[in-house]
Amino acid sequence: EEILQHLNENLGFLDGAVITGGEPTLNKDLPEFIKKLYELGLKVKLDTNGTNSEMLHELLEKHLVDFVAMDIKCCFENYDKITNSQVNIEEIKKSIDIVKKFPNYEFRITIAPGITKEDIVKIGEYLKSRQANKILAIQQFRPGKCFDKSLEKFPKTSESILEDFANLAKSYFEKVIVRKE
């Protein structure tokens, strides 16, 4: 209710809302919250890591989001190591297949410590094989407020590394975007 009140008070300055992490699809009340955003006349962008394909399917089936950005952390075989948690890769794959059917989406990968060119190749090959290769955003890692505190000691990803990864990704994706600070 606090969030909705704040948004309502600032409607003159807003045209949309971004729903982001933790992982918003883990909240069972998310569809109802989004309906309230639409009642305010706002567009909705959802940021997700793809770990709850069932909720993602419901949101897209009911046309409750205008844009989906799904993070893919790394190649599938390294997910547990890179995320420092156990991840159900089949859920990620199901989510990819759901998102690709939606007209307004992008996949994103943050070039964080431990991410390699091999990750880009494997992600690119997989998404292309699933016809889910419309847009990839290559994002700059920025230390600060990292869930994994051990990452705080690393510098932000250099622009030259971002460009190298983006150039590699262009072999697999229709469009590659580089996002820096």
Protein language model annotation of sequence segments:
Residues 2-16, 25-162:
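Conserved AdoMet/S-adenosylmethionine-binding subsite of the radical SAM
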Residues 163-181:
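A C-terminal junction/extension of Radical SAM enzymes
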Residues 22:
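Short, charge-patterned binding micro-sites
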